[in-house]
């Protein structure tokens, strides 16, 4: 997970880490997603029920194409919080098979103004 910091640069943020994004600035991320499971992940266009999305605070970011086991994609310029933050705010990233289940690890970052 990389988040654009207050200086406008991409900053790698580890699970449980923090980043200063600037007060009121949109929180924008670049997410590298790897399928470590047994089955291929399908995009919503191929599987409206069960297609895979990354979720963050109620927002959903669908994967753009099929990801085979051990495959990887990068979701560029994902706006996690359009209105930014005014105080330290945790953001939890998860995976969801649309309409079926939330799965995989929880990845949490704290965004500060």
Regions found by a protein language model. Give the residues of each.
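Asparagine-centered strand-capping/turn motif at beta-strand->loop junctions
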Residues: 33-37
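Terminal connector regions
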Residues: 82-111
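Short, solvent-exposed loop/turn segments enriched in Ser/Thr/Gly
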Residues: 13, 23-30, 74, 87-91
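Short, hydrophobic/aromatic beta-strand segments
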Residues: 38-54
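Intrinsically disordered, low-complexity Pro/Gly/Ser/Thr-rich segments with frequent PxxP/GP/PP motifs
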Residues: 58-84
